[in-house]
Structures are given as C-alpha cells and as structure tokens.
C-alpha cells in the first residue's frame, strides 16, 4: 500500500478517466441521469446481496475458525455482484422482460450491503470473544487454572447470539453518519480501500472495463471450480478425525511435520497469499520460523525446569501457555503502538486543519490547469453527495434510542455486565469510533479489534472476579461492533462519493446489510458449530483467538500471577520488540521500511502453527514471479484467481458440513509414518 499522500495525488486523475469512459465526466454530466436514491436500492440487488452474504460469511467463518487471518473480500464482492446482476438481466432479457439498466450506483449499493453483512461474521466475534465464552474453551484452559471459573461460561445459542447482534450492531451506523461531509468532502480522507473499490466499480461500467470484468469473472469461475473439486477430492482421503489426508501431508519431512512445517494443499491460504501484500506473507513465515523453528523447541527443552514435564500438549501451565501469552504480547504491543500512532495523527491533522484556516488534511494543491479539469466533476460528486441528506436529528435520536435499548437488553443477555457499564461504553464509543474512522481514512487500518481489547481489559478489571471474564468479553463485543461498523460506513461513503451514489442509498444499504448479517452470520456459524469439532487445538477448526481472548479477559481479572515461570519476562521482551519494530518501520526510509516485518502478522503462527504460513508464502511466490513475467496480467487477474480459490473452498464447506451432520465419513485415511528400520 502506498503512502496516503500518493493515494491523494493519483486518485483524481484515475477516477476522472474511469468516469469519463462511463459518461460521468464534466462534459457528460448534463447527459447522464444519476438515478434517484430509491432506484439505486433494488429488489434484485438485495437478493444478490443476501446470496453473496451467505457465501462470504461462510468464507469469513472458515478463516476465522482456522487461522484468524481474513483478507479483504471487498473486490470479490464488487466483482461477483456485477456478475450476478449481469446474469440476472441477461436471462430475464432473453425471456422478454423489460429490465432496468444495471448502474454503477446499484453495483456500489450491492457491494456495500454484502460487506456490511459479512463484516458481522468478523466483528460479531464468532471466532474470538463470543467463542471464548464457551465450555470447550473453558475446559481447554483448565478448570484449575487461576481465574478460569465454571460460572464464566456461556455456550453458543442461536437465540442469544442473534439477539446480541441486533442490539449492538446498528449503533455504529448512527454514531458518525452526521460527520460524513466533514470526513469525505472537507477533510478529503482517502480511505484507500474504499477508493480502490470505487475505481473498480467505475471501470466495470465502461466498455473496456466491462470486457475486462467478463474475463475476470470467467477466471474466477474457473479457479472456483478447481478449488471446489480439489476439496471434494481431498475429502475422500481425509478419514475419520483430523490426522489423515492432504491436510496432514508431511511434504517437508516427518521431523518438520512435527513442528507444523508442511504444505497442506489449501486453496484458501494460497489465495490469501495472492491477495495479501508480500510483506504480510513474508512476516507470517518469519514468525513461524522464529516460533516453531527456534523458540518452542528451546522452551520444550526446559520441561521439568521451567514447567512440569508431564503436562499435556494443551495445558496452560506448560509450553502451551508460553505459545498463547507470547502471541498475546506481540498482538497487544503492535495494537498499542498503532493505536497511539493513529490517535496522534488524528489530533495532529485536526489541529493543522484548524490552524491553517481552511487548508484541510490530505488536500493536494493542484496546478490551475489540472484543478480546472477536475473541478466540474468534483462539483458533480459534491452535489450528488450532499443532495440526499441524512438528517442530523435522525442520526442523533437513532443513536440515543438504540443505546437505550441496548443498555437495557445487554444485561439481560449477560447478567455480569451492569447497565451503567454499558451506558458508559456508549458514551465513550462515538469518540473512539471517530478516531478509528479517521485513522482508517488516513492509513487504511481498521483497529476495531484493538479498541475491543481495550474495552475487554477495562471492563474485566472493573467487574473483577465475580463475572469479570464474561463482562470483559461482552464489552469487547460492544466496542468492536460500534467502532468497526462506523469505519466501514465511512469507507462506503467514500466509495459512494466517487461512484456518484446517494449517501442515503448507501446508508439504507448498510442498514439492510447489517440486518441480513445479524441473521446470516449466526446461522452460518451454527452450521460450522453443529457439523465440526470447533475449538479442538489438534483439529482443523482450532479457533485460535477464542483461547487468546479468554486468556486476555482472565489476565484483566487476575493480573500476571497465572503466567508460567519466566513467561512474563519473555512476553515483556516480545511486547517491547513489537513496539520497536513498528517504530523502526516508521522512522526508516520507505526503501528500507518495506522490508521490515509486521509484528501482527508474525504473531499469528506463534500459536496456530507454521503450515498456513507456508501456504501463504507459496501464494506470494507465485504472485512475485507472475509480476516479474507479466505485471499487467497479474494486476488484472491475481485478485480474481485468489477470490476463486477462496470462494471454492468456502462453498465446499456447505456439502462438507452436511456430510458431517449426516455422519457420512470419508472412505479412506491417507497417513504417513517412518520407514521400518532393522
């Protein structure tokens, strides 16, 4: 990702070109009619959004419950939305029906609705704070573990999960909607992902862009089919349990396999490697080498000295405890640094905006000729964005009303959380939502999980041992939902601004998508919950962040007394190292900093294992070579191939879950063992 300044400089010309092709340039502004906001929200769009919402929720859950690494699927949502509606109109057109034209505004609304829907599969905590409350996570940590009490257990249930989603997921939409003009027009925040999505959608609705989109859809469908049938083929050899098949193929040897170094032929993680930046994939592999190549083998030699030698592989008093807490320390160090960095940048830019009397953040001073070329189109975008206002009284009363309902309802779901604590959270939340949304606009980083962890620690420590664990986890959910949805909404406003979409249609689309997500996300999670062994540390669906979040909540209640010997010292070293590495990335020149690893990406394999890092590295090597051979082709089709690989794997999870529910086991078990020696 380039710098924010770079984004601000290139955005205008590129969008002008894309819009010009579609008839949105200044010259064509009087010819093309921008649809009314009600025409942008269509029945077919809602149906397509619901279908894609199910697919992307399945994908998000699978990634959440396996490794916890979720790439951005916004481009995939826009591309598949374009394909499905185009197919819809083509079929009905051949049947003789009169079909309304498919506009870029409708495409934007669909993409917004899908992202709002599957975003709740992440911010809903189905692989983190919500799952951390269940019986299995409690038992995995151990009933005799300090602070881990049996009363702090709440198993997943569709009733309370859907109810909780409805009472907390809408507040973020109302918290900052009144500031949309300030953030998008006045401050001209770039929201790089939102800008990239707008450029993509604009390109779809040009002649050349439509041709490329058709090729991308064809490519996506091809690799989706390959991924689906490959997973089907793998299933026949996966046997009963989690120790058979290609997922446990010792491709680097049996010794490396014992330390989780193997290639498991996963299309999903290869696809993630194609989508994620090279530095993320390389950082993940480096973290795997440091932890599973050196650190864990070294600590394991201290069995009987630092910790009892006869403990199980998942006992927190042994090596397992080091794995979890060192991962937590790196994640917290990285999150704390970036939180302080974003808040500092936010305060600095706001103060500069005030002191310079109208010179706003991220405004590039264009030459007069360039400014005159873009001014007419920018005026059209501004007029469109400001035409369909969302009344401030609606935003304010909506937030207050929803906060009142949530304040009364959340304690009914979680009795450990008192109403006045929920109220305090909703008083502070808009400020945190602004910080996160502004920071996301500057850097493209959504730090919702970091704000959630802060709420977790504060509430867990305030409530104490009498229910603090559940209270902290629930508070994490409240904060994450508000902060995450507010940033997503503002990013979607940026996309809508650049595609001449009405802010009112974008807001309605977010409401519809959130409503769908409150139902679809729990239902798709329930499919996994009933079909697979979720939370088994030796299985496929490890749910790594469930254990991490519960341990953080226990840490907020108990302090550091529960850590194994020398664990606090090692955690402190890694916590400081995460901060220093981030600082080094910021103070060194870009030519150097691009090679410095990301601590957050390094932390993930510390707990999960090295296998997925190898898969992602395979993806990044493929992309690297492809970029050297044909950069234009890689830019056009790498995302489509990655999306196909990920989507095919996600679709396979449905028949796989059905087979599991019906107790139909694979017919063969393929496994490996050392050769017999004399």
Curated annotation (Swiss-Prot):
It is a multi-pass membrane protein. The chain crosses the membrane at residues 41-61, 65-85, 113-133, 158-178, 226-246, 279-299, 324-344, 394-414, 419-439, 467-487, 512-532, 561-581, 606-626, 641-661. Expressed in roots and leaves. Disulfide bonds: none annotated. GO terms for cellular component: vacuolar membrane. It is found in: Membrane. Keywords: Membrane, Transmembrane, Transmembrane helix, Transport. Pfam families: OPT. GO terms for molecular function: oligopeptide transmembrane transporter activity. Its main location: membrane. May be involved in the transport of nicotianamine-chelated metals. Belongs to the YSL (TC 2.A.67.2) family. This is Probable metal-nicotianamine transporter YSL6. It comes from Oryza sativa subsp. japonica. The gene is YSL6.
């Amino acid at each position: 990702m380039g710098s924010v300044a770079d984004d601000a400089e290139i955005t205008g010309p590129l969008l002008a070109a894309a819009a010009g092709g579609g008839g949105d340039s200044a010259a064509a502004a009087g010819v093309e009619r921008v649809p009314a906001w009600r025409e942008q929200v269509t029945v077919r769009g809602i149906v397509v959004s619901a279908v894609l919402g199910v697919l992307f929720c399945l994908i998000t859950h699978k990634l959440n419950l396996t490794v916890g690494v979720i790439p951005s699927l916004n481009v995939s949502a826009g591309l598949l939305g374009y394909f499905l509606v185009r197919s819809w109109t083509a079929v009905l057109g051949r049947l003789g029906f009169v079909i309304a034209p498919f506009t870029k505004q409708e495409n934007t609304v669909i993409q917004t609705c899908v992202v709002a829907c599957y975003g709740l599969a992440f911010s809903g905590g189905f692989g983190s704070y919500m799952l951390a409350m269940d019986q299995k996570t409690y038992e995995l940590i151990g009933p005799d573990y300090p602070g881990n009490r049996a009363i702090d257990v709440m198993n997943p249930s569709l009733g309370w999960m859907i109810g909780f989603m409805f009472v907390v997921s809408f507040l973020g939409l109302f918290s900052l909607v009144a500031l949309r003009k300030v953030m998008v027009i006045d401050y001209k925040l770039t929201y790089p992902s939102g800008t990239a999505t707008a450029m993509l959608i604009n390109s779809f609705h040009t002649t050349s862009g439509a041709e490329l989109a058709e090729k991308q859809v064809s490519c996506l469908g091809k690799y989706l089919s390959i991924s689906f049938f490959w997973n089907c083929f793998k299933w026949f050899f996966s046997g009963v349990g989690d120790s058979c098949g290609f997922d446990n193929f010792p491709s680097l040897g049996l010794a490396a396999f014992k330390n989780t170094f193997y290639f498991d032929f996963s299309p999903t993680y290869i696809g993630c490697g194609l989508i994620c930046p090279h530095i993320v994939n390389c950082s993940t592999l480096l973290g795997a080498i440091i932890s599973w190549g050196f650190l864990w083998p070294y600590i394991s030699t201290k069995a009987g000295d630092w910790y009892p030698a006869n403990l199980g592989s998942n006992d927190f008093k042994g090596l397992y405890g080091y794995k979890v807490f060192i991962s937590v320390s790196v994640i917290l160090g990285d999150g704390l640094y970036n939180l302080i960095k974003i808040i500092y940048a936010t305060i600095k830019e706001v103060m500069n905006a005030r002191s310079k009397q109208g010179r706003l953040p991220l405004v590039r001073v264009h030459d007069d000729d360039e400014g005159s070329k873009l001014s007419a189109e920018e005026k059209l975008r501004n007029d469109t964005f400001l035409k369909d206002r969302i009344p401030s009284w609606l935003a304010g009363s909506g937030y207050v009303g929803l906060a009142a309902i949530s304040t009364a309802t959340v304690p009914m779901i979680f009795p450990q959380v008192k109403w006045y604590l929920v109220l305090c959270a909703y008083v502070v939340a808009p400020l945190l939502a602004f910080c996160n949304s502004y920071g996301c606009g500057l850097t493209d980083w959504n730090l919702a999980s970091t704000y959630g962890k802060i709420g977790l620690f504060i509430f867990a420590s305030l409530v104490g041992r009498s229910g603090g664990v559940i209270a902290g986890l629930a508070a994490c959910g409240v904060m994450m939902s508000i902060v995450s949805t507010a940033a997503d909404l503002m990013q979607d406003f940026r996309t809508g601004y650049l595609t001449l979409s009405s802010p009112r249609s974008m807001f309605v689309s977010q409401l519809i998508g959130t409503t769908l997500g409150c139902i679809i996300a729990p239902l798709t999670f329930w499919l996994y919950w009933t079909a697979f062994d979720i939370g088994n540390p030796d299985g496929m669906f490890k749910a790594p962040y469930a254990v991490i979040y519960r341990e953080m909540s226990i840490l907020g209640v108990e302090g550091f007394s529960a850590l194994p010997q020398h664990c606090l010292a090692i955690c402190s070293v890694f916590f400081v190292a995460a901060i220093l590495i981030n600082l080094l990335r910021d103070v060194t020149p870009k030519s150097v900093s691009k090679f410095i690893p990301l601590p957050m990406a390094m932390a993930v394999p510390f707990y999960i294992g090295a296998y997925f890092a190898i898969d992602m590295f395979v993806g990044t090597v493929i992309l690297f070579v492809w970029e050297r051979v044909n950069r234009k082709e890689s830019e056009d089709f790498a995302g489509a191939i990655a999306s196909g690989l990920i989507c095919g794997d996600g679709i396979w999870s449905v028949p796989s879950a059905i087979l599991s529910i019906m107790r139909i086991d694979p017919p063969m078990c393929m496994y490996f063992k050392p050769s017999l020696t004399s």
